[in-house]
Amino acid sequence: IAKHYDLSPMRGAHLMGQAHHESGGFKKVSEGLYYSTPERIQAVWPSRFATVEDAEPYAKNPEKLADKVYGGRMGNKGQGYLWRGRGFLQLTGRDNYRKFAGEMRLPEVMTNPDLAANEYAFETALWFFEANKLFKIADEGVTDDTIRRITKRVNGGYHGLDDRMEQTRKINTWLMAG
């Protein structure tokens, strides 16, 4: 796999630094959408929940929350929970699953999306980097700017930027030493 994607140390550092953060240290390969308080929901998705009261019905209800935040976009037709984030970079949305399954010749992912969390967690991350031209950015070096730009594409914002920077730099040091 690494040969197919020509994983240089810089590319590997960016990929693994982002994956480390998104997966909680490579421990979480399926998006956890169980939030016990509406305050936390509103803090995580302020653009979807203007007030804490708006988030109240979604606390302790991951399926309902996923349908609210992911339903009707990214190719989802009200099936946000089915197409929630999975894999080391949290592949999200029916459109992304469809593209991944097609380009990687893994049609079974469309009938069993949990495969993206289990058997293909690393492949989803590689595919996402390639499909979104993130390896091209990674080739520019391991800098604040490149980590920030890749984070924006992976996360849609800058959530966890400090950790992503720390992990990417640490992994880059290890890979460059070897």
Which residues does each PLM region occupy?
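Peptidoglycan-targeting cell-wall enzymes and recognition modules
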Residues: 20-128
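Extracellular low-complexity, O-glycosylation-prone Ser/Thr/Pro/Gly-rich "stalks"
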Residues: 159-177
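Acidic helix/loop microenvironments that form the catalytic cleft of cell-wall polysaccharide enzymes
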Residues: 19-22, 139-160
